[in-house]
């Protein structure tokens, strides 16, 4: 403690905040306290106090980011994302609350809410005589430890009477790394019942060829976040080229996400990766705006 005028109780409180912060980190084993640590902790407590009320009162909104086929020049799907639209703070991005909800378990209820909203939206399109597109939803690792997970998903699909192919499940690459044997079995069971599975964020963590060899999925979503901001380097081109070719040889569809520039899009097309998701085509937008974009004449 550098300031002798800080009361002992305050100093202990500061040390407590720093201790909680450092426990969340996997690399550093010490940290210096500053006020941002305390502010972040207080913000998390506030979100925990408000999350139940927010869900019950419709503050969580489903946003959709289109998946666009560059060759066909049309939207072929979307990913459902969630935004917390707070009456006082405005839009709270998911990076602020998803990890907290993973930690306290609230993510299970929030995921279920998003899935239900998506199924309802697809049912609406069908009832209106419009041609729906598949919507993918994110799945927390916590769901995969529920022995009834498959039954929950199938029950939701049956409740709204939609084809299974229109609700796709997105599992992040990091899930498979932690328990590949368990998740390989779960995925095999899900696919046997006709549920479409995507591996999200491939290339953003510790991508494993062994993982791809053992896990049978429908779509590989390649994270293009590793692109150099100044342009695509030769090494990046080589990695991307062979990753896409490998996925296709394994009979997987490929979606490139995080595509932000025309150069990136054109290079992906040259590799026969024609479905993209990213700000180059469209940012995540409210579901009502997505409908207008999808069905504009």
Model-assigned labels for residue ranges:
Residues 2-10, 16-63, 71, 101-105, ...:
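C-di-GMP signaling machinery
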Residues 25, 57, 69, 87, ...:
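Nucleotide second-messenger and two-component phosphorelay signaling modules
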Residues 1-2, 30, 40, 70-79, ...:
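Catalytic core of bacterial c-di-GMP phosphodiesterases, primarily the EAL and HD-GYP domains
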Residues 21, 53, 124, 159, ...:
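Alpha-helical scaffold elements within enzyme catalytic domains, especially in hydrolases
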Residues 11-19, 80, 96, 100-101, ...:
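Structural preference for long, well-ordered alpha-helical segments in enzyme cores
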Residues 32, 36, 43-100, 138, ...:
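Active-site core of bacterial EAL-family cyclic-dinucleotide phosphodiesterase domains
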Residues 70-71, 87-88, 140-147, 166-181, ...:
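EAL-family c-di-GMP phosphodiesterase catalytic domain
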């Amino acid at each position: 403690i550098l300031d002798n005028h800080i009361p002992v109780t305050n100093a202990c409180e500061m040390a407590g905040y720093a201790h909680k912060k450092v426990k969340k980190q996997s690399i550093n084993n010490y940290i210096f306290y500053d006020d941002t640590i305390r502010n972040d902790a207080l913000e998390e407590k506030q979100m925990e106090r408000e999350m139940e009320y927010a869900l019950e009162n419709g503050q969580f909104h489903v946003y959709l980011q289109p998946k666009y086929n560059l060759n066909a020049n049309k939207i072929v799907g979307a990913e459902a994302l969630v935004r917390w639209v707070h009456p006082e703070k405005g839009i709270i991005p998911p990076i602020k609350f998803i990890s907290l909800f993973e930690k306290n378990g609230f993510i299970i209820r929030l995921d279920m809410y998003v899935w239900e909203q998506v199924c309802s939206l697809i049912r609406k399109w069908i009832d209106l005589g419009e041609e729906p597109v598949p919507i993918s939803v994110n799945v927390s690792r916590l769901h995969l430890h529920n022995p009834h997970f498959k039954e929950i998903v199938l029950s939701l699909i049956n409740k709204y009477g939609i084809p299974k192919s229109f609700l796709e499940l997105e599992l992040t690459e990091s899930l498979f790394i932690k328990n590949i044997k368990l998740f390989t079995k779960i995925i095999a069971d899900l696919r046997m019942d006709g549920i479409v599975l995507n591996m999200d964020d491939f290339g953003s963590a510790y991508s494993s060829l062994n993982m791809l060899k053992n896990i049978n999925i429908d779509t590989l979503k390649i994270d293009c976040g590793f692109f150099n901001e100044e342009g695509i380097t030769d090494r990046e081109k080589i990695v991307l080229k062979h990753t896409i070719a490998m996925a296709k040889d394994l009979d997987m569809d490929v979606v490139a996400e995080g595509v932000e520039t025309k150069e990136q899009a054109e290079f992906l097309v040259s590799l026969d990766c024609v479905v993209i998701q990213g700000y180059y085509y469209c940012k995540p937008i409210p579901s009502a705006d997505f409908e207008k974009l999808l069905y504009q004449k």
